[in-house]
């Protein structure tokens, strides 16, 4: 039912009527200025009206000022993935240097023009000689920075957006800094502010700031607005429930609906099908979309992204004498943001660019003085993004990178879902019809129960216990099968050494999990690159060449002319005003009366 309904929605055909018992969505005029599209990410939040040309992009973090004299340690969620015990004597650094040499030798065999001339690389020692002698020079403040404007409001109880990026190592000690989403999912942990409800509170503070201060929409008027939330393809059902509660009850939107980011990306790019590769700040997700449906078996989220490339770039720059020697991305948000900017300015995947390139960057010191640094960069600008294809370089941010595929329904226990498998097990009667129904379901799943004997009044308690054991054994077997399937599903995205697969091989593995040869061929011919870290020059051509060398199908890697990080947001804005999307909206009254049932029935993806 879900698949046919969602397919008809995406293709523009007349949508199927809602299930009996749920109210028909009211046919109200769609006003794009009254629709707020929200795309939350690990590092950035993109939010804006559906009628806007581009969304606002904010840092998706909040900093709470600590009480004076607080004895506990401040909590700092890092802007960049932390290094995994990296020092000059560690085995990780030895591995990193070995892999750097491997990548360097590969680049030496690249042809730079039609005359078959090979690249000539500048050794790091030569670059270090220049960079170590480079001195910073004083420069005036940027034109956008007023001379009398305070750099940091030290009295503000809460900081948002770029104010957090102005916190150096010393100033950051006065704040608890939280990123509510990390590695593509809610940042739930055992430290301060790490509970699920605390994470939702952080989201509420950030989104309220964006709505009131940046979009100039008073919170009391959100009852006249609607919201579209872009969520991950690999999702946790309980988290989606909390998101809807946040939008409808806590923020007070009139109605909302959810859409998966890869599906929204196909709408934003104007394609009907394709393999969507979303390279974000802290994760890379792959999903195959056909007729507006994200194929369940082909979804995967890999725990590496642009932030990991930042750390690789920093180690490479330090090897060639990085002139800003005090750079401390672990404690200073100023330095972490600087490194992210250097990746965007320096890095590329164009093998024809070789030799030393002179670059500049500006930095504000604690005393308010702006400095200009000059640095020479060679193949370091090319090696850092190549870590997407040589994941051994990414071991510096954790040797074991998590891989997430969509969990089965029975693995996502939710006590508020009346159709949850565990809920049905615990609330079903121990004898009579329901016990037999559960056994019948178990039989259809492949379990053969023992023959039933006639039940007498004296034997009822005995049979009840026997049924409990039978059901428990059956579900244990099914749970083991599900866990094994989940493990096998994740294991196919690791190589023989247990390392997560490179980007090109992960895409091939994801597409090959599809059952139809024709569908596979279509996906290889339409690979869409999106995400904030997919804007590296030359990435699409490099990825296309790598995949073409490993498959026989025609390979086309697409990247649209717009900002790759905004494609999903634009697609969600387009979906929100479509006539066929009317049945997707969930109102406050629907959510209050029906809860998860209405989300299950109206979500445009398989629940």
UniProtKB/Swiss-Prot annotation:
Q: Which Gene3D superfamilies match?
A: 3.30.420.40, Actin, Chain A, domain 4
Gene Ontology annotations of biological process type: chromatin remodeling; DNA recombination; double-strand break repair; regulation of DNA-templated transcription
GO molecular function per UniProt? ATP binding
Does the record's keyword annotation contain Ligase? no
Cite the SMART domains for this sequence. ACTIN (SM00268)
Q: Which residues carry this modification: Phosphothreonine?
A: 9
Q: Which residues bind ATP?
A: 278-281
Keywords, A to Z, come to: ATP-binding, Cytoplasm, Cytoskeleton, DNA damage, DNA recombination, DNA repair, Nucleotide-binding, Nucleus, Phosphoprotein, Transcription, Transcription regulation
Which stretches are tagged as biased composition: Polar residues? 1-12
* The UniProt record lists the keyword ATP-binding: yes
Q: Name one GO cellular component term.
A: cytoplasm
Q: Which residues carry this modification: Phosphoserine?
A: 11
Q: Where in the cell is it found?
A: Nucleus; Cytoplasm, Cytoskeleton
Primary role: Plays an important role in the functional organization of mitotic chromosomes. Exhibits low basal ATPase activity, and unable to polymerize. Proposed core component of the chromatin remodeling INO80 complex which is involved in transcriptional regulation, DNA replication and probably DNA repair. Strongly prefer nucleosomes and H3-H4 tetramers over H2A-H2B dimers, suggesting it may act as a nucleosome recognition module within the complex.
Q: What is this protein called?
A: Actin-related protein 8
